[in-house]
């Protein structure tokens, strides 16, 4: 669970320059107050905001970087590969002309000692008098599909204000070329954000934050799976099949990962994320603060990919087409998210006893709509569109909605920084579960003893800053399930393995009611801090 300024959000759409702090809550004792969504822990992100009276400041920074892939898989040398194949399968190889493995190893040794002694064409391809084809050049198929990438980042911000009015405006841009050997591997993101805070009266403050992020990711995508093909042996030639080697494959590109990257069409993914965050703060009494927060977050996802149709050849010398039936795929998804938080905090002391009590209410709702379409057999491959398909047109849509409602509290107790106690609790409900098991209570308690503050440790105070023993216990929920999984539905399942003739479709109840799950954590530890 990722909370950005106390509200769930997408960390990938946040400009790193706008982040003030990041806190990770890993155990149930600290995460229990976040209820049924904190099963995997909580990441708290706080964005930058001016504090107090601030003179006008204009900041600009940039970053230029190069990146290269590391720890690449190591391919076996061709001679070792051929020897292993000979030991396992015999002397006849499976490539064009059924070459002899033993002759290949001999030719390879000769070629290494004197390359001009063997007449090769293209990428080290030798056709013997008996029609068998031997591949002499070795290469790193993984390395051949990669290059050094370049990235540049730019950020600008303006900050200022008085003791009554404060503001911050920022914008950021990142452009990454990617490490694949193509201009189709790119990522770009633009962020703008603004914050304003006004002390309307001594006891009332109004804050407003707005942000907008737009990103575009483009990656080459092959219907054959370029990454999977990196398992090919190191003799696979790059480039195209030379003339005179194979009549069927003459002039066609070889089936290698680098060629697939070059010929494949890019899949394009666009994200737009506008967000508005409003916060009202009231301070009616000393130590007592009431806060009301409202957030609207919209996420727009737009995906498109056209498979294209490419004719290629293989080391067997054949001719093939991928895919045999080209298609255009488009997907759009819209998500509207609303969140309300209302909570109060009271901080007070009774002698040496310090208390901090917080209680509040939270409600969130999300509505998502997805549409997807595939159009087969494009008439104009240079400008593919859903309407220009000459074959099948498929369209589907999905709708998803859920809400969360809960009340929470936290009590902190501190006695002279020696004895520390924290109690948390949240009564949470989620629409993802049946009514009879929709709500759950998730408590936690943690205690600490700072031994360094005891009188018998006074002699260590000049070098020992803290020696704390702590223990905690907590229970958190898990609502990370589909929104309607508790509703029994009839779905279509295709049964394979031949037990139903022709793979006929059968219908069955495929889901069972879900129950809220609870994760328990018991922890203990010690903290030691030295003075220097």
What feature does the model see in each segment?
Residues 1, 195-204, 209-214, 252-307, ...:
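Extracellular/periplasmic, surface-exposed regions of secreted and cell-surface proteins
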Residues 17-19, 28, 38-42, 55-57, ...:
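Extracytoplasmic
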Residues 4-6, 26, 47-49, 62-64, ...:
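Flexible glycine-/small-residue-rich
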Residues 14-17, 34-39, 147, 184-186, ...:
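Short, glycine-/polar-rich solvent-exposed loops and beta-turns at beta-strand/coil boundaries
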Residues 73-122, 213-251, 305-307, 372, ...:
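A surface-exposed, glycine/aromatic-enriched loop/edge motif typical of exported proteins
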Residues 51-183, 281-283:
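Residues embedded in well-ordered regular secondary structure
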Residues 22-23, 43-45:
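Non-catalytic regulatory/gating segments with a bias toward low-complexity or hydrophobic composition
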Residues 5-32:
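Short acidic/polar hinge/loop motifs at secondary-structure boundaries
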């Amino acid at each position: 669970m990722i909370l950005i300024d106390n509200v769930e959000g997408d960390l990938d759409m946040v400009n790193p320059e706008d982040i003030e702090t990041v806190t990770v809550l890993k155990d149930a004792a600290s995460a229990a107050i976040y209820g049924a969504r904190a099963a995997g822990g909580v990441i708290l992100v706080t964005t930058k905001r001016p504090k107090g009276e601030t003179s006008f400041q204009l900041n600009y920074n940039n970053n230029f970087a190069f990146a290269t892939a590391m720890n690449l898989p190591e391919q076996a040398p061709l001679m070792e590969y051929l020897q292993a194949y000979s030991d396992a399968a015999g002397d006849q190889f499976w490539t064009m002309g059924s070459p002899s493995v033993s002759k290949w190893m001999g030719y390879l040794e000769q070629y290494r000692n004197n390359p001009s002694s063997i007449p090769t064409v293209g990428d080290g391809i030798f056709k013997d008098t008996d029609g068998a084809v031997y591949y002499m050049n070795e290469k790193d198929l993984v390395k051949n599909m990669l290059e050094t990438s370049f990235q540049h980042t730019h950020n600008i911000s303006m900050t200022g204000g008085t003791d009554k009015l404060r503001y911050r405006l920022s914008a950021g841009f990142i452009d990454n070329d990617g490490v694949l050997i193509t201009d189709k591997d790119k990522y770009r993101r633009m962020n703008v954000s603004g914050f304003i805070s006004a002390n309307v009266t001594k006891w009332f403050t109004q804050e407003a934050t707005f942000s907008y992020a737009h990103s575009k990711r483009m990656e080459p995508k092959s219907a054959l799976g370029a990454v999977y093909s990196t398992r090919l042996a190191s003799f696979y030639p790059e480039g195209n099949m030379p003339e005179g080697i194979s009549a069927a494959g003459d002039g066609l590109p070889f089936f290698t990962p680098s060629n697939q990257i070059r010929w494949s069409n890019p899949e394009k993914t666009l994200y737009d994320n506008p967000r508005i965050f409003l916060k009202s703060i009231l301070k009616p009494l000393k130590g007592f603060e009431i806060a009301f927060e409202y957030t609207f977050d919209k996420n727009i996802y737009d995906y498109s990919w056209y498979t294209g149709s490419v004719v290629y050849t293989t080391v067997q010398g054949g001719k093939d087409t991928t895919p045999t039936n080209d298609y255009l795929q488009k997907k759009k998804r819209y998500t509207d998210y609303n969140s309300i938080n209302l909570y109060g905090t009271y901080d007070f002391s009774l002698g040496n006893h310090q208390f901090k009590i917080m209680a509040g209410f939270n409600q969130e709702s999300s509505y998502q709509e997805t549409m997807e379409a595939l159009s087969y057999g494009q008439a104009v491959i240079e400008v593919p569109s859903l309407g220009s398909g000459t074959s099948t047109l498929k369209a589907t849509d999905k709708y998803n909605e859920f809400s969360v409602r809960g009340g929470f509290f936290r009590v902190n107790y501190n006695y002279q920084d020696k004895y520390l106690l924290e109690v948390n609790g949240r009564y949470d409900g989620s629409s993802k579960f049946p009514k009879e098991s929709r709500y759950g209570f998730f408590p936690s308690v943690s205690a600490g003893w700072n031994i360094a503050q005891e009188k018998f440790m006074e002699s260590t105070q000049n070098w020992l800053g803290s020696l704390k023993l702590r223990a905690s216990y907590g229970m958190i929920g898990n609502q990370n399930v589909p929104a309607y999984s508790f509703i029994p539905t009839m779905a279509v399942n295709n049964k394979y393995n031949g037990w139903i003739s022709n793979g006929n479709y059968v219908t069955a109840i495929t889901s069972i009611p879900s129950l809220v799950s609870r994760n328990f954590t018991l922890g203990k530890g010690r903290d030691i801090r030295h003075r220097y």
